[in-house]
Design a protein with these regions (language model features):
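A short beta-strand element within beta-rich, extracytoplasmic domains
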Residues: 38-49, 96-98
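Extended, low-complexity, turn-rich repeat/linker tracts enriched in Gly/Pro/Ser/Thr and Asp/Glu
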Residues: 46-54, 100-106
Length: 116
């Protein structure tokens, strides 16, 4: 299993976090620590080849116990095909979780807004 580390960058002045090329068979997406500089609200885009998999955005305050993030309408941030959601999050950590499917290769791109 390969660990997929989040990549942090500033794109056009906006903080962005990415996990690229996640597969269910070989990869573990690592957590991202949310700080004041990296936002309190944001949008997430799921893209790539899903191959029957489901991608969910999760949060945790201890980095061990994870729960699904809800969007602004209270719906779980989860997709089986290319999708985009807006969310707020005050948890200490966030990460994507890819389950099921095969022959998948998914990118997760988050733009964070807040105190930066």
């Amino acid at each position: 299993m390969a660990d997929i580390s989040p990549t942090r960058s500033i794109v056009d002045g906006v903080p962005t976090v990415r996990w690229d090329d996640i597969t269910t068979s070989t990869d573990t997406p690592l957590k991202f620590a949310v700080t004041e500089q990296w936002g309190l609200a944001g949008s997430v885009q799921f893209a790539g080849t899903f191959g029957g998999s489901t991608v969910t955005l999760q949060m945790s305050n201890d980095g061990t116990n994870w729960v699904d993030i809800k969007d602004l309408q209270g719906i779980t941030v989860s997709a089986t095909a290319t999708a985009m959601f807006e969310f707020t999050c005050s948890a200490a950590y966030i990460k994507p979780n890819v389950t099921g499917g095969s022959a998948n290769n998914v990118d997760v791109i988050i733009v964070l807004r807040g105190l930066y």
